[in-house]
Curated annotation (Swiss-Prot):
It is found in: Secreted. This is Cerberus. N-glycosylated. It comes from Mus musculus (Mouse). One of its GO terms (cellular component) is extracellular region.
Length: 272
């Protein structure tokens, strides 16, 4: 009797285990097709939903109107606000504000492109000032020479200097071919001084950056008229500050500075 009870106690858990194995296998076999069917249904539903809803991150400007574009922008802004800072960073990087973009464009228009090694390139305000100086004191012949840029350094505009600046001088005459001559102009600023006194005893000295060494060249132009046309051109080689007093006396200022000289004007003196 006791032996029979022991056998029943041993066989009872084994029977439950067999039933559980069969039931679990049948349940697993049933749940796997259900899972695959659910996945297919979910994929189809997501695909249909994706076809119905437009992509918020793709815009076709030529296919949408202003109202649709504005609605897309609003939806995109809402979505980005929900996603948080992770999506806002690329938004600010790829779409900068208008004021930042305008500042970048304006600075790019005004500044010269810097080289790759990081060295600063000299900007051109002084070249523009030199060009205005050129128009005001050198030519005054209209807009024909507006594109001329002189190789003048920035510090030379503010300090006292006097030197030769190379440029291409165009010699022109009516019914004649233009001739371009390599020449130099005197550029700089020179000092001025006035000694105190009364009446005739007061003396004023103004120094000018003038040529101290130059040659005069007679240039014959090729013209259609039978009368030959000859132009006199002053080719400047060296420049220094020349002092001119109120009485018309002109002499070299050894410890002086700078002024301006117009090439081509007739000179009263020729200094070798």
């Amino acid at each position: 009797m006791h032996l029979l009870l022991v056998q029943l106690l041993v066989l009872l858990p084994l029977g439950k285990a067999d039933l559980c194995v069969d039931g679990c296998q049948s349940q697993g076999s049933l749940s796997f097709p259900l899972l695959e069917r659910g996945r297919r249904d979910l994929h189809v539903a997501n695909h249909e939903e994706a076809e119905d809803k437009p992509d918020l991150f793709v815009a076709v400007p030529h296919l949408m109107g202003t109202s649709l574009a504005g609605e897309g922008q609003r939806q995109r802004g809402k979505m980005l606000s929900r996603l948080g800072r992770f999506w806002k960073k690329p938004e600010t990087e790829f779409y900068p504000p208008r004021d930042v973009e305008s500042d970048h464009v304006s600075s790019g228009m005004q500044a010269v492109t810097q080289p790759a090694d990081g060295r600063k390139v000299e900007r051109s305000p002084l070249q523009e000032e030199a060009k205005r100086f050129w128009h005001r004191f050198m030519f005054r012949k209209g807009p024909a020479f507006q594109g001329v840029i002189l190789p003048i350094k920035s510090h030379e505009v503010h300090w006292e200097t006097c030197r030769t600046v190379p440029f291409n001088q165009t010699i022109a005459h009516e019914d004649c071919q233009k001739v371009v001559v390599q020449n130099n102009l005197c550029f700089g600023k020179c000092s001025s001084i006035r000694f105190p006194g009364e009446g005739a005893d007061a003396h004023s000295f103004c120094s000018h950056c003038s040529p101290t060494k130059f040659t005069t060249v007679h240039l014959m132009l090729n013209c259609t008229s039978p009368t030959p046309v000859v132009k006199m051109v002053m080719q400047v080689e060296e420049c220094q500050c020349m002092v001119k007093t109120e009485r018309g006396e002109e002499r070299l200022l050894l410890a002086g500075s700078q002024g301006s000289f117009i090439p081509g004007l007739p000179a009263s003196k020729t200094n070798p």
